[in-house]
């Protein structure tokens, strides 16, 4: 059994700072908020870059 480590991430969206948590396991980044979640692969980016992108997408969808 592996330990999941969640880290805090912040991003700016429409002039507001939004916060969430993300984990990076097996080449995938998972971002979760109280209202939703998104997962994506690195694709040459750092886990932090992917997490910020996913968090902004969740905010755009009204789920952050």
Question: Across the structure, where does each feature detected by a protein language model lie?
Answer:
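N-terminal acidic leader/helix
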Residues: 2-34
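Mixed-charge, Lys/Arg-enriched low-complexity segments
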Residues: 36-64
């Amino acid at each position: 059994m592996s330990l999941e480590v969640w880290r805090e991430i912040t991003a700016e969206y429409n002039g507001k700072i939004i916060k969430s948590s993300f984990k990076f396991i097996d080449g995938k980044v998972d971002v979760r908020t109280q209202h939703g979640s998104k997962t994506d692969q690195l694709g040459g980016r750092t886990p932090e870059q992917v997490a910020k992108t996913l968090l902004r997408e969740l905010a755009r969808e009204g789920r952050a």
